[in-house]
Amino acid sequence: NTLVHVAGKGVVISEPSVVAVETKSRKVLAIGAEAKRMLGRTPANIVAIRPLRDGVISDAAVTEQMISYYVRKVHQGGWLSARPRMIIGIPSGVTEVEKRAVRDAAIRAGARWVRLVEEPMAAAIGAGLAVGEPNGSMIVDIGGGTTEVAVTSLGGIVTARSIRIAGD
């Protein structure tokens, strides 16, 4: 799922990371919940895809359009500027190429700047754990594309393992 959190407002969008695309023109027909309802129910000329697979980008152009859609949706709601700052969760252990693909897609979609945070650290912060303390905390995050296991301490990840098997 794609979650958009706005400071002071909380989570303002929580929708499936699914996009319905016309196969020949590559025109995006639906994004999010509407596109998910189309999974397995489309004619041959329309395909409902997940542009993020196993926690990484599988279709850069469609991912960019999906991010752009959510930026516009949040901007129209009056929650943020048209060129927001983005913090994006990524699986631990992704390659530099995969990180760059995420960052580039967000910039092309209109982000002013992008910071990438490993998902176990984001989960620890979201759970209210004292990640800056010299105490170890184990995080197990079973997401849609990956399962992440990590130990955090002193504001960082001490060790982590990401398995590209999860709840999807």
Provide a role label for each language-model segment:
Residues L3-I142, A150-D168:
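Nucleotide/phosphate-binding catalytic cleft detector across ATP-hydrolyzing
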Residues G145:
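Conserved Rossmann-like nucleotide-cofactor binding loop
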